[in-house]
Swiss-Prot record:
Biological processes, Gene Ontology terms: mRNA processing; RNA splicing; tRNA processing
Localization terms from the record: Plastid, Chloroplast
Annotated protein name in UniProt: Maturase K
UniProt function note: Usually encoded in the trnK tRNA gene intron. Probably assists in splicing its own and other chloroplast group II introns.
Protein's organism: Morus alba (White mulberry)
HAMAP family for this protein: MatK
Length: 505
């Protein structure tokens, strides 16, 4: 079992146990405040930035020192004996500070790796850029795919138990329970989606940390099954079962979950062509084997979610599709398998015969209807795809308006450079171009036709610059040589901004 440690333990042997006293340090709240100011624009900043001050931090720490019991009921009013009249503000500050504290063990782990004091081999981690070579090279060899949505909400206590692998300080875990009490109804087994939405907006940093911890625990078990399934029949399954139910406090015995013939069931998991790919909360399972094998995986996933994470999952919502007949949506692309049939005549001595040759090719398309829906959501067009003016940008200068539209258009072409057919992107370019013109024409309160006639045909020439021409201007020699030697798709891996369709809702 020593060779399985990289998959199962996730290197949880940190000795930085005393995290709870940091909640009484002023600099923690300063860090949290700075991180809130520098937060990515993909996350809505609804924090306390405009109200935070060092005086409020000192007052909060003083009140926490004076308290004998740091417990607040979720049903209390905004006024309580700890926070006084500023419960929402103080609770927000503590939760932001706690989000910084629980990330410290991971930061120390990263710093030690960068300094070379210890070199860690992460078996379960891959970059998002590895997905594109996977689609290009490996996907044509597979036959079946299943879309898997990682289920949530999850039982609150399971979240705390998962963090016990990383955070050894019991006081910090009790503080986490305090915040979960504050945001959710502790008496329910399933967190309502509306509470998840409130919590993710009020404290996105802590929400992402808890969610990523949940996904990491789930994938550590799933990838163990994937990578070591061929060794299960050769080793004792006791450690495997003990790892899945890591506390021994769950009511269901192992024998009830996996029947007595579990080694026979695990025997069918042996498959070297099983692939697992995930981005955010959506993942895919793809295999070269039969649908029976895919149903086996669906069976294990449902048992894992229901008996280990106490999350109800409906097996009927996990569809197993044949790649040559169905397409699936992932990372903003619609991907499917094309089979090109050809007949080859072969002659051997005096005998000649015909052979059917089937060539598989992955087809990645731009979801034009979903892109139009995304543009409609951002008020660039209506539901039918008719361009409208961006009224919120009308107060900006002409240069800023044009630069914003051109940047959006080029980013979309840049992201979908790996698409098999780019004709649908020209409709998106048309929508953005006319939306830009209508936004500019909104300023002098003239019509679009008058505005175009006044400025001439050279208006917005940036929109007509092809993505290939832009790349050839940046890399003149390298790009031209690459195009001559390779006529297929070119995946641009220097993606710094993911479009809205990629983010799983």
């Amino acid at each position: 079992m020593a060779e399985f440690q990289g998959y199962l333990e996730l290197d949880r042997s940190w000795k930085h146990d005393l995290l709870y006293p940091l909640i009484f340090r002023e600099y923690i709240y300063v860090f949290a405040h700075d991180l809130g100011l520098n937060r990515s624009n993909l996350l809505e900043n609804v924090g306390y930035d405009n109200k935070s001050s060092l005086l409020i931090v000192k007052r909060l720490i003083s009140r926490m020192y004076q308290q004998n019991h740091f417990i607040i009921s979720a049903n209390d009013s905004n006024q309580n004996q700890l926070f006084g009249y500023n419960k929402n503000l103080y609770s927000q500050m503590i939760s932001e500070g706690f989000a910084v504290i629980v990330e410290i063990p991971f930061s120390l782990r990263l710093v030690s790796s960068l300094k070379g004091t210890e070199i860690v081999k992460y078996y379960n981690l891959r970059s998002i850029h590895s997905i594109f070579p996977f689609l290009e090279d490996k996907f044509s060899q597979l036959n079946y795919v299943s879309d898997v949505l990682i289920p949530y909400p999850i039982h609150l206590e399971i979240l705390v138990q998962t963090l016990r692998y990383w955070v050894k300080d019991a006081s910090s875990l009790h503080l986490l329970r305090f915040f979960l009490h504050d945001y959710y109804n502790w008496n329910t087994l399933i967190i309502p989606n509306k509470y998840i939405s409130i919590f993710s907006k009020s404290n996105p940093r802590l929400f992402l940390f808890l969610y990523n911890s949940h996904v990491c625990e789930y994938e550590s078990i799933l990838l163990f099954l994937r990578n070591q399934s061929s060794h299960l029949r050769l080793t004792s399954s006791g450690g495997f079962f003990e790892r899945i139910y890591f506390y021994g406090k769950i009511k269901h015995p192992v024998e009830e979950v996996f029947a007595n013939d579990s080694p026979t069931s695990l025997w069918f998991l042996e498959d070297l062509f099983m692939h697992y790919v995930r981005y955010q909360g959506k993942s895919i399972l793809a295999s070269k084997d039969t649908p029976l094998f895919m149903n086996k995986w669906k069976y294990y996933l449902v048992l894992l979610w229901q008996c280990h994470f106490y999350v109800w999952s409906q097996p009927g919502r996990m569809y197993i599709n044949q790649l040559c007949k169905h397409s699936f949506s992932f990372l903003g692309y619609l991907s499917s398998m094309q089979i090109n049939l050809s007949v080859v005549r072969s002659q051997m001595l005096e005998n000649s015969f015909l052979m059917d040759n089937a060539m598989k090719k992955i087809d990645t398309l731009v979801p034009i209807s979903l892109l139009i829906g995304s543009l409609d959501k951002m008020k660039f067009c209506n539901v039918l795809g008719h361009p409208v003016s961006k009224s919120t940008w009308a107060d900006s200068s002409d240069f800023d308006i044009i630069d914003r539209f051109v940047c959006i258009c080029r980013n979309l072409f840049h992201y979908y450079s790996g698409s098999s057919k780019k004709k649908s992107l020209y409709r998106i370019k048309y929508i953005l171009r006319l939306s830009c013109v209508k936004t500019l024409a909104r300023k002098p309160k003239s019509t679009v036709r008058t505005f175009l006639k006044k400025l001439g045909s050279n208006l917005l020439e940036e929109f007509f610059t092809e993505e290939e021409k832009v790349l050839s201007l940046i890399f003149p020699r390298t790009y031209s040589a690459l195009r001559r030697s390779y006529k297929g798709r070119i995946w641009d891996l220097d993606i710094f901004c993911i479009n809205d369709l990629v983010n799983h809702k």
